[in-house]
Amino acid sequence: MVSLIKSIKAHSDKAWSVSAHKTVPLLATASTDKTSKIYKLSVKQNFPQVAQLEDTHKRSVRAVSFKPPLPGVESNFLDLPALASGSFDSTISIWGIDEPETEILSSPRNEWNLMAIIEGHENEIKAVGWNHNGSLLASCSRDKTVWIWETDPETLEEFECISVLNDHQHDIKHVVWHPHQNLLASSSYDDTIRLYKQDLDDDDWSCVGVLNGHEGTVWCSQFEDNHRHQESNESSNRSKIRLVSVSDDMTARIWSKYIPSSIKHKSEMVWEQESILPPVHQYPIYSVAWSAQSGKIATVGSDGKIVIYIEGDDNSWSIDSVKESAHGVHEINSIIWALLDDQSEVLVTAGDDGCVNIWKP
C-alpha cells in the first residue's frame, strides 16, 4: 500500500521533474517557476531544502539530472555532486558544489555554483540525462533532435557536442541512458522509441533500433537496472536488456533485446515487445520508474494515479498497488525511485500543484 511520508510545497507553479543522486541523499526538482531546488532525503531532518538554483534560466526548468558518481573513485573530494538542468529557454545549466559529502549532509545550506551554460538547441529542451560514468550528457528538444555532449567528468569545465541525432519526425519528450553502458533511448511525439549507439570504428553515433507499437506520444522510457537476465542467459552467450515505456495511449510496455556476446552487425540486435502491463490508467501516462532494488515498476500520469507493478517468477506482471489522487485533482508529471539517508527506498513524485511528494511504496 502506497502511503505518504512527506508532501513538500516545492514550487509556486508546476513541478515538472525530480532527480535523486545515486550515492548522496539529495533530491533535485524542476519547475515552471524557473527554479530548481535541492532537498536532503532525510526523514529525521524532515526533508529540508538546502539550495535554490535560480536567476539562470529565463523560462520553465523542464528537467533535472544528477551526474552519477565516478566508477571506482572512493574520495569524496575527487567526485563532488553535479546537476544538469534543461529549460524551455533552450539552454542547459551545469551546477556543482565544492563541499564533500560529510559537509553537504551536516550543513543546513549548500552553496551550488553555476559551472557552465550549454547552448545549441533551437527550441525548448524537454529532458537531459547523464551516461553511467558522467562523461556524456544527452539532451532532447522540441526541435526534433537529440544532442550528445562530451565532458571530463572530474572537472565539467567544457562540454563538446559530439553528435546531433535527427531521426525522430516530431517533438522528443525524453532521453535516458542504460545504467551500465553507452546505449541511449529517446521517446517522441511520433509514437516511437529510438535507440542509439556509437560505432566503434568511426566514433559516429547512429540509430540502431526503432520500437514501434505505441498508438500515441511516448512520454518516457526507462531501462531495467538488473543483471539477473544477463546471468540467466550466460549459457546461450546472449545478454538481455529490457526497457519500459509509457504513452498517451494509456499503456506501459516492456521491450527486450538480446545481444550476442560477439556482435558484428547491427542487424544482429533484435528488439521485441515482451509485454503490455495490466491496464489501470484512464488517461495518458507521463512517467515511469523501474526500481533497481525491488524490480518493481511505477507509473504516473494525467489521471493522478500512482500504479506499482510487480513481476512474477514466470515473467508475468501484476498490479502491486494503486494510489488514487496522489496530488489531489492535479496531474503528475514525474516519478522516480530514490534512497533515503537510511538506505530505505521511496518513491518521489512531482505534480502540477507544485508539490513534490515522497511515498513509502
From Swiss-Prot:
InterPro entries xrefs: CIAO1/Cia1, G-protein_beta_WD-40_rep, WD40/YVTN_repeat-like_dom_sf, WD40_repeat_dom_sf, WD40_rpt
GO biological process: iron-sulfur cluster assembly; tRNA wobble uridine modification
CDD domains, alphabetized: WD40 (cd00200)
Family according to the record: Belongs to the WD repeat CIA1 family.
Origin superkingdom: Eukaryota
Signal peptide residues on this chain, from the entry's feature table: none
UniProt name for this protein: Probable cytosolic iron-sulfur protein assembly protein 1
A GO cellular component entry from the record: cytosolic [4Fe-4S] assembly targeting complex
Principal subcellular localisation of the protein: cytoplasm
UniProt source species: Scheffersomyces stipitis (strain ATCC 58785 / CBS 6054 / NBRC 10063 / NRRL Y-11545)
First and last residues of every WD repeat: 10-49, 56-105, 120-160, 167-206, 213-265, 280-319, 327-361
Pfam families xref list: WD40
